[in-house]
Amino acid sequence: MVDTALHPIPGRRTPPHPRSTLPLTTPPAAAELFGDNLDKAIAYHESLATDGSVRGFIGPREIPRLWDRHILNCGVIGEAMEEGISVADVGSGAGLPGIPLAIARPDLKIILIEPLLKRSVYLGEVIEQLGLDNVSVIRGRAEEKAVRKQVGHVDVVTSRAVAPLGRLASWSLPLAKVGGRMIAMKGASVAEEIERDAKAIRNAGGGEVKVFTVGGELLDEPTTLISIRREK
């Protein structure tokens, strides 16, 4: 199912950087997506390309593709989220999708969940360097009781293909409030995963399932999302 009635991104204003003055490596779509926060997006790109690569979070082959395959395609998922809601990012890694989402949507309150110490330390550094007051980090695994207690119940739980769909639902849906959603970035095989893992999704409390794309006006390849509503 393709959902075309997506939520407009609140607060997006005229990009502060004329296209002719953007750094050569910054695509025009970044100015349209991040608006007044473009400088933060550029700083995050620089951090991933340098510090993130040195620390082993980003492979050398991914550096030329950071904007299109990582930052922009994560930032556009905000199109599927209402204004002012709470979001948890499961298995955040180097901050994807949580950091681009936070930059594009400063109205959201975002919790990054990451089990590895070196990555959670990096996330804390990025949050401080970019001045992202709407973001916090919890070190741990989403399925741990202590993490669930810290997070509480949020409106949306997001992730970026960190596990098969059934397992991902078992980690994500318990963090969402009843009526809330998990919204995961997935690829072309998502329909097969839905059929294969239908029982696991139901057991995790999942109900209505939607598959749709976002970013069609900005990206050459729109981002595919699966949304599962928590019903119990």
Swiss-Prot record:
The keyword Disulfide bond does not apply. InterPro entries: rRNA_ssu_MeTfrase_G, SAM-dependent_MTases_sf. Transmembrane segments: none annotated. It is found in: Cytoplasm. Keywords: Cytoplasm, Methyltransferase, rRNA processing, S-adenosyl-L-methionine, Transferase. Pfam families: GidB. Its EC number is 2.1.1.-. Residues 1-24 are annotated as: Disordered. It comes from the Bacteria. S-adenosyl-L-methionine binds at residues 91, 96, 142-143, 160. GO terms for cellular component: cytosol. GO terms for molecular function: rRNA (guanine-N7-)-methyltransferase activity. HAMAP family: 16SrRNA_methyltr_G. Specifically methylates the N7 position of guanine in position 518 of 16S rRNA. Belongs to the methyltransferase superfamily. RNA methyltransferase RsmG family. This is Ribosomal RNA small subunit methyltransferase G. It comes from Corynebacterium efficiens (strain DSM 44549 / YS-314 / AJ 12310 / JCM 11189 / NBRC 100395).
